[in-house]
Amino acid sequence: MTRFPVFQLAFLMCLCIGWMFCPLSVAGLTRRALVIGLGEQQDKAWSKINGDRDVPMVQQMLRRSGFSDIRTLVNQQATKAGIVRALQTLGSDCQAGDVVYVHFSGHGQQMTDLNGDETDGYDEAWIPYDACKEYCSADRGERHLTDDELGVLLSAIRQRIGKRGKLLVVVDACHSGGITRGMEPCGEEADDVERGARNVFSIPGKAAPRGSAGQEEEEWVTISACKSYQTNFELKDKKVGKLSYALCQLFEQHQALTNEQIEAELKAFMKKHPGRMLQTPELTGRKQTMSVSGVFRRARKGQ
């Protein structure tokens, strides 16, 4: 007669202990971020930009949105090896249900597509601190962080956080390279700071047939400052990235926007603050199934 209450008590104690030691994996409360910003490059052929100035601004936005694990890489820290290592570590630390934000502010460049997954024959790449602007003996392209490489790293994070998790990637960089289609002049501001290169990083004899491999759809949402063939300009008076600034302002004022409203607000901001060329921000990936506003919810008191 007395054994049943004892077993019941033991069962309840096990439940309590389990809840104490794994609340984050069950509730999915951990918000993690990696913020990368470059204003300097090892190769001085790159133009001076202010990507490093975006970092504290984005950090503040994330803290207000309840992010407790915010990691940063700035300038010399953001080598290709440093970025890859940071993304791998971030992924290994993630739990099912986590919310993950990855931000890159810096130069972008197109380069020779090596695996044939691009219909235009060019990969888009983030430019780490140690990447060169032109093909040379010191850098044959291995220091660029291509969209293909990023896809592998981000897919690993996506797998770790599972279906209940959220992964948002923000790229405040130029993807245009040497492609000029779609670059309609809209001003004469010669001192606009451009985040990117007009030249393509060409790898001799390495180009794959265009579109021969096909592309896999992103399993996350990416917010880009411009289309892959456009140029990204900074906000001249504040010397920060337009996309970074616009997002911070947007989620300071609004907390429950649809993805369509977010994209419309970002486009309106770019039109209000034009550079020498038109740029069109866009949301890609799982924008039909993942709410961006859900990433930027206000932190509750005590969190």
What name fits each language-model region?
Residues C16-Q303:
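Cysteine endopeptidase catalytic domains of the caspase/legumain-like
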